[in-house]
């Protein structure tokens, strides 16, 4: 396959200076990193804070230049200033905070901002805007103000702005770090669809293990170096090494490892809930079969039937402390607040409701 990114012995050195400009120390934020990314791949780069992953990401878009070593994007050297324009069109970049990337007051105008600066004809700009917003599921919000969108929606608009530039790959530097779980799910699902349906190369910088588990290949960074690399199964099977450098593993991997300590026969490369359940079923065939039948019955229930069954179970047990339904958080001041209340709150005597005071929810 064609290599879209080629990194060879890349070093990026940060220099510390005192108030007078004298050098007081040096540190290799990226230290002799070599890796290749093939066209159409979904790559995840993992690492704790200070591992060098974000510094590496900024080299791919030529925001930073190597101290030594080489980095080529579509065969063009990022260290050659004559290539910067082409490289930044080939490798789009999305950052943590979508508010730092959105500059226009209307969604569609923001998405069209990049192509407009390239001198693209107006008719072509609007075609790109419509296509990009459609690919990220935000076409119905094209006339909205970004300030009225959720964090996940804003990040999808930021991704659409990059797509409108027609890049060959998108580098995303922890794009879900500031989002709630629902927003994270929206963004990651968008990235998967872009990769699988549109064949866009994705390079995802993240510290969320479940996000990395969706990638084709993972590179784990520690102290500026590549500590581990391979498929998600290969990387997360190195449980002890991951823990040693201060990183977690997917929840299913963690559970499987814990069960293994108690003598269960669990594979080292479990990374998904389905794999975990299959392995548990093999260890406890009779119990697992009954549980599977029960899950199938629950899956076939309607939403209303599930709600009624769960409510009755909660009422009978008396163990539920708090259960929320239809709770909303609205970002803009001029939007009507839906009623938000606690449906059930049981612990023998405790029963409360949520009341709204201006823009603050409080228990009363």
Give the ranges of each region predicted by the language model.
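The feature captures the beta-strand-to-loop junction immediately N-terminal to the Walker
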Residues: 46-48, 358-360
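Conserved catalytic motifs of ABC-family nucleotide-binding domains
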Residues: 166
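Conserved ABC ATPase "signature" region
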Residues: 123-141
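Conserved ABC ATPase signature
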Residues: 145-149, 153
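Helix-to-loop junction immediately C-terminal to a conserved catalytic motif
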Residues: 61
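Conserved ABC transporter NBD signature motif
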Residues: 69-79, 87
């Amino acid at each position: 396959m064609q290599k879209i990114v080629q990194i060879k012995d890349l070093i990026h050195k940060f220099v510390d200076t005192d108030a007078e400009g004298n050098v007081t120390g040096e540190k290799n934020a990226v230290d002799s990193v070599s890796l290749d990314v093939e066209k159409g791949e979904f790559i995840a780069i993992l690492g704790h804070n200070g591992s060098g992953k974000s510094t590496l990401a900024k080299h791919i878009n030529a925001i930073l230049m190597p101290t030594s070593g080489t980095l080529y994007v579509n065969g063009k050297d990022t260290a050659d200033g004559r290539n910067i324009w082409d490289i930044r069109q080939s490798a789009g970049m999305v950052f943590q905070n979508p508010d730092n990337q959105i500059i226009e007051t209307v969604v569609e105008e923001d998405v069209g901002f990049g192509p407009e600066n390239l001198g693209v004809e107006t008719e072509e700009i609007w075609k790109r805007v419509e296509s990009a917003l459609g690919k990220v599921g935000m076409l119905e919000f094209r006339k909205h103000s970004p300030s009225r969108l959720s964090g996940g929606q804003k990040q999808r608009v930021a991704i659409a702005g990059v797509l409108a530039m027609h890049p060959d790959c998108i580098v995303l530097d922890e794009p879900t770090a500031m989002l709630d779980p629902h927003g994270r799910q929206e963004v990651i699902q968008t990235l998967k669809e872009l990769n699988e349906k549109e064949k866009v190369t994705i390079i995802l910088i993240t510290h969320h293990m479940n996000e990395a588990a969706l990638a084709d290949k993972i590179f784990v960074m520690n102290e500026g170096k590549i500590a581990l690399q391979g498929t998600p199964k290969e990387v997360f099977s190195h449980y002890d090494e991951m823990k040693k450098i201060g990183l977690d593993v997917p929840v299913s991997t963690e559970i499987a490892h814990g069960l293994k300590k108690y003598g269960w026969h669990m594979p080292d490369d479990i990374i998904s809930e389905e794999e975990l359940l299959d392995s548990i079923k093999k260890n406890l065939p009779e119990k697992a079969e009954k549980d599977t039948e029960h899950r199938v019955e629950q899956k076939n229930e309607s939403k209303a039937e599930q709600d009624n069954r769960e409510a009755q179970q909660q009422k009978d047990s008396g163990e539920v402390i708090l259960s929320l339904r239809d709770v909303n958080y609205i970002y803009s001041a001029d939007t009507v607040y839906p009623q938000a209340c606690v449906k059930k709150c049981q612990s023998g005597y405790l029963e409360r409701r949520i009341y709204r005071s201006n823009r603050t929810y409080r228990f009363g």
